[in-house]
Amino acid sequence: MTPDDIKLLQSRCVSEVNVDPNVLHAYQSNAECADYNNGMLNRIDVPLVTIRATIKAPLGLRNRVSISEDGRVGKTAFVESLNIKVGARVKLVYNVWTSDSLVNGAMGNIVGINKTPEGYVDFIAVNFDKPKAGINQRKKYPKQHAKYASRNGTPIFRHEMSFDLSKRVNSGQGTVTQFPLKLAWAQTSHSLQVKNVME
């Protein structure tokens, strides 16, 4: 980099105080993102909903299931405990329906957390930034969509993903079932994709 490049970059630096908290924040580490995302989640004055993943592994191998520092199960992007609220900024971490733009990295806001009479969360309604994202999903599940149609809520359901219990061949596989979402006010610069950042 030239001295002029450095000068230009330094002229673009802003302090945290001057940044709108709702704009997308890029950080270097998952820990920094988690701190910011949890702080933003705590600002929303509605009840917190915690959804635990269902994790299965062959008998005697459950202790081999690894949970990363940021809560991901095995080598998947699904989290062991998903903490969300209506109004939370989220992104998909799994290709739900690629031709319907419900792809890994698609971002939006939670407009509904639908529970059964027993309190089981059966789907999460997300208003995606790209209005056409989820059109087919909304048509496929008209009853679920109708509840959140005024806010263009697309129903997102749990998905199951398999993962290896270790790097060794034939070490066994486990499965995790969880909503393919994560908080997204902040993301690592590594995970950001220009196509997913709307103006």
Located regions from the model:
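Conserved helicase motor core of P-loop NTPases
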Residues: 1-100, 115
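Conserved helicase C-terminal RecA-like lobe
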Residues: 96-97, 102-199
